[in-house]
Amino acid sequence: MTVSYGAPGRVNLIGEHTDYNLGFALPIALPRRTVVTFTPEHTGAITARSDRADGSARIPLDTTPGQVTGWAAYAAGAIWALRGAGHPVPGGAMSITSDVEIGSGLSSSAALIGAVLGAVGAATGTRIDRLERARLAQRAENDYVGAPTGLLDHLAALFGAPKTALLIDFRDITVRPVAFDPDACDVVLLLMDSRARHRHAGGEYALRRASCERAAADLGVSSLRAVQDRGLAALGAIADPIDARRARHVLTENQRVLDFAAALADSDFTAAGQLLTASHESMREDFAITTERIDLIAESAVRAGALGARMTGGGFGGAVIALVPADRARDVADTVRRAAVTAGYDEPAVSRTYAAPGAAECC
């Protein structure tokens, strides 16, 4: 039996690098999706093909970390995690199509892993609840691919719903729906892809996580969430000033997430926009994960009339989001494109987007 299963990319409205610190985040699922079509066969491997790559990749069912590399490592990691948890995985043929841009900060990796998990589960009749699937997906990304990411991307892909943002508490692993329908208030969410690509596997992302872990250790706690209620004064006990800045971002970002959710409840998109901009400033000044190109896009959007703008995703490239009055959307988009090109960068791809359904079997 051939099955098809789709999983979306995501935009994190606010709450960056908070998930592995057991804080808060507020993502939405995107209309852009990765679809995996899987036909089980009596073989000892899965042959995977992607519309983003030439040729095919062979994934042995008994694969181990490091055996499969490149784009296919994410699919292999999903297979490895399923089998490690005792779930059945048959051999077969797997076809992957996607309109989630790789390296754009929209979590193409989580979309791929989620779609593979869903397709194999649907083909075998295996029922795995969404939280467990998110944990399997994180295990695939952390332990097979080697990217030290948290649960945010996977929870967003699995729990996403139309006109809904997801307030995630990573300490308790709870997901609370929050109405997100800016169009009803004549506001649009612009997605501005800088075309500067980034990678999570290794590098700066891992350094930021290690910095946060050192800060927590200096404070005598297991995670920075444990000092959230103490306020910024608690950070004086952190030995390294850079680690202290990283921790300050996490604590202030957690509060911005809660304030943003409250603003949505009041349909106050002016306040929500201001929080986006404050988040971007914190990522630039305290967490040091933006770039000159990303800063230019965010700042140009605000100057042109956006209510607020911020980078979304792990950093060092990717995309910027902005809340924009509907009647200013074209001017903001044109201004951002022109500013980037004038500065010598590729023209950003600017589009409207919205909260869409989460992962599901395709008809």
Swiss-Prot record:
EC number assigned by the record: 2.7.1.6
Molecular-function GO term, any one: ATP binding
Reactions catalysed according to its record: alpha-D-galactose + ATP = alpha-D-galactose 1-phosphate + ADP + H(+)
Enzyme class: transferase
GO cellular component terms, semicolon-separated: cytosol
Active-site residues from the entry: D153 (proton acceptor)
PROSITE patterns: GALACTOKINASE
Pfam families from the UniProt entry: GalKase_gal_bdg (PF10509), GHMP_kinases_C (PF08544), GHMP_kinases_N (PF00288)
Subcellular location: Cytoplasm
UniProt KW Ribonucleoprotein keyword: no
Pathway annotation: Carbohydrate metabolism; galactose metabolism
Binding of substrate, residues: E16, H17, T18, D19, Y205
Site annotation Transition state stabilizer: residues: R10
Chain residues that bind ATP: S50, G103, S104, G105, L106, S107, S108, S109
Domain of life: Bacteria
Gene3D superfamilies: 3.30.230.10, GHMP kinase, C-terminal domain (3.30.70.890)
Keywords: ATP-binding, Carbohydrate metabolism, Cytoplasm, Galactose metabolism, Kinase, Magnesium, Metal-binding, Nucleotide-binding, Transferase
Annotated function: Catalyzes the transfer of the gamma-phosphate of ATP to D-galactose to form alpha-D-galactose-1-phosphate (Gal-1-P).
Similarity-based family: Belongs to the GHMP kinase family. GalK subfamily.
The protein, known as: Galactokinase
UniProt organism field: Mycobacterium bovis (strain ATCC BAA-935 / AF2122/97)
